[in-house]
């Protein structure tokens, strides 16, 4: 015989089951449905925003720039490939053309060859870029150079070279193309910065300085262009498995010529390019593409600066000891 207390407990349990079935579960599935619909609408808007858009990619001959150009081209954008090596750009153009048949409607890329390190080349290059399709929707400032060396050993010409390529070149190109965007009240400027635009690590001074400057400039530009309907996105990746360290400049201006450990263990350029594509499509403002520990370092730098400085000093000692051993 069931006692009154047991019967009461059973009734309570059944009531809870009924509430769960009639209220909580439908609510849960409803929320999931709304979220899925939101994601679908977001993807649809992103595709519409990027399809047929004129996208300029600097540093498109290799690494991240090449993969960015590839993913935007596959999405139906009209891509302008920029770089110093005309042969490499033409080969990449043929590669994209060969892959077009399996990717639906795509456009023949346009090639513009120039050197960001040459201040006199920027204005003519911008004019040539505008001649490709008549206007620019999205400018991806990707081209850059890295650096390895101690501050005390580095000649100032090296600092100037890194700043010219990583900061002054992109700034000059942005300023050259900006008036046409403002006139159309449409445009999107993307700066490929680095986590080292948010924190500085030892033996990367010139590179970190150029990326800090990049972050600051494009943050200012975003605010100033708000009323002109110009979007500005700053992307700050961590280590990417490319030849960036191999082609880095050293203290005396020579080529570093080695794939260092952190770069070798970095994310693939294909993955990062897809993340950049998604961020641009969603018109994100500031994107940090790093693993957990580097992301935490950014917060530690802000919330516990003394701890951050001790960590960096320890890293400097270890790296110096490793070089001297």
Swiss-Prot record:
Claim: NADP is one of the keywords in the record: yes
Transmembrane segments: 18-38
Gene Ontology process terms (BP): adipose tissue development; brown fat cell differentiation; ether lipid biosynthetic process; inflammatory response; neutrophil differentiation; phosphatidylcholine biosynthetic process; regulation of cold-induced thermogenesis; regulation of DNA-templated transcription
Predominant subcellular localization, coarse grouping: endoplasmic reticulum
CDD domains (alphabetical): 11beta-HSD1_like_SDR_c
Matches recorded under Gene3D superfamilies: NAD(P)-binding Rossmann-like Domain (3.40.50.720)
UniProt binding sites for substrate: 194
Record-annotated active site: 207
Topological domains, Lumenal: 39-325
PROSITE patterns xref list: ADH_SHORT
Topology of the protein relative to the lipid bilayer: Single-pass type II membrane protein
Enzyme Commission designation: 1.1.-.-
Record keywords: Endoplasmic reticulum, Membrane, NAD, NADP, Oxidoreductase, Signal-anchor, Transmembrane, Transmembrane helix
InterPro entries in alphabetical order: NAD(P)-bd_dom_sf, Sc_DH/Rdtase_CS, SDR_fam
Top EC group: oxidoreductase
GO cellular component annotations of the record: endoplasmic reticulum membrane; membrane; nucleus; peroxisome; transcription regulator complex
Binding site for NAD(+): 62, 64, 207, 211, 242
Location(s), subcellular: Endoplasmic reticulum membrane
Protein family per UniProt: Belongs to the short-chain dehydrogenases/reductases (SDR) family.
Name by which UniProt lists this protein: Dehydrogenase/reductase SDR family member 7B
